Amino acid sequence: MEHLSYHKHLSIENTEKLRIVLQEFPPFVRDYFRGLEPSTTAKTRLSYAYDLKVFFYFLQQKNAYFSHKEIKDIVVGDLELLEAVDIEEYLEFLKVYQDSNGKTRTNDERGIHRKLSSLRSFYLYYSKRKLIKNNPTIVVDMPKLHKKQIIRLDPDEVAELLDLVEFGGKDLTGMKKVYYEKNKLRNLAIFTLLLGTGIRVSECVGLDMEHVDFKNNRIKVIRKGGKEDYVYFGDEVEKALRDYIELSRKHIQACEGHESALFLSIQRKRMSVKAIENMVSDSAKQVTMFKHITPHKLRSTYGTNLYKETGDIYLVAEVLGHNDVNTTRKHYAALDEDRKRRAAKVVRMREE
């Protein structure tokens, strides 16, 4: 199915997973997911389904009325029986619980926030269609989200990381040396691309050979929600991509169905998000022990550097593919404060 394009294949895969999960729900739940389809991606709907699966599990485990019911026997009218206190109990349950396999699960404030958002959307669907009158989710306050400090690499750490990827195999021996040399150009291209454009790891994984346009020094990416966008790159990214494509990628015969993929695994298949996440984490640990670096942190590093150079929050939002500039502003608010502090020292009222 690779010929359909990576993103279409992923959408089909998520749709099939969603259908399997929906088989565990009461029939009326399928109406909700049908209603979501025009405005959401398959990945989003699958996430909602997993969230609701936890909610129904909670009802069976902790609610006296639902504990004697099979999940498939629940009807839409049963949703009205719950009150705000039940929803609050659910949020408390989410902090730490044992799943159906006995595994301990936890949620931080962001996980709880998302699951309440999913539940509100679920209730709102039936409320708008007048299938229920009582909606207890709207009177429960959303958990407060504390601002997270932006973790990013300093300029010297960026240089050290790229040097490690490009020259770090000198002291390796045996199979480690062979593996390093075989993948060095690919890995350097990935790190340089992430640090030099700020694209998401999912966008990186989804790149095909034909998406690289050296004539205009840009790549075509598929953003969240399936929107196509062009991202421009500079000389360093161009060199890393050219070296990888000309000296490595063109000489690899990809497995059937993966011929179009830009970045291939050692098995000659399209690299996965997890593979790149592990590669970034393992390499970054050798450069900085006190920062947990992920591909998203490389994206934050690029966004920070771009904002420092331009001071243009709208440009940063556009380049990073944020639909709402307030999302960007929220992430880089600390840098705004730093600029304001420096601005306060620029204007002098008396000459010294």
Question: Which residues make up each language-model segment?
Answer:
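Conserved catalytic core of the tyrosine transesterase superfamily
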Residues: 1-352
